[in-house]
Amino acid sequence: MPKSSRTCRALCGVDAARVTRVPLLTRIVVAIDPAAGSGEHSDETGIIVVGKDAGGHGYVLADLSGRYTPTEWARAAIAAYRTHGADRIVAEVNNGGEMVEATIRMVDPGVAFTAVRASRGKVARAEPVAALYEQGRVHHLGALARLEDQMCCFAHDFDRDTAGYSPDRVDALVWALTELLVTPVAGEGIFEAYRRLAQQSAEGGP
């Protein structure tokens, strides 16, 4: 895990996204990137809470990521779901499959849940979210140092083996913002949505 660096966060532009309050939010999701294990040297489980306002801006509300057992991360995510009044939990199921949802249902059978499966690489999945940041459409409530450090170190040539860790917090962030803001318009596929966001970013549009 990279050390906290205020200078690094300033240079990569994350500080410019920081806010001290949020407007009325129309949707809130809790996103989970479950780790494959829970041992001392296992990756952490990413748990990120993000909201969306009526103007199409996203607000990163909390980072609850950490090294958990499956039951522990399910409890942490559901506690965040209740605390923030979220309307859905979104979880990657590449590691664990149906057991991810089953673990959550064991803690609270009534939560709204969406399973997502990664079919593209981490960098490719993050590109449309990076475009949202470039457009100034994503804001961080207060300081989220460990998430922001991961964001600043997550370049196009990121290599997990070289870095010595998985960008679990960034993965969860990407799933949350994709669920809220990377939504295809009618008749538009997800790749067309990605291209549309990239074009808006290049043109400086909303």
Please name every model-derived segment.
Residues 125-136, 153-157:
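Short, surface-exposed amphipathic charged segments that create phosphate/polyanion-binding patches used
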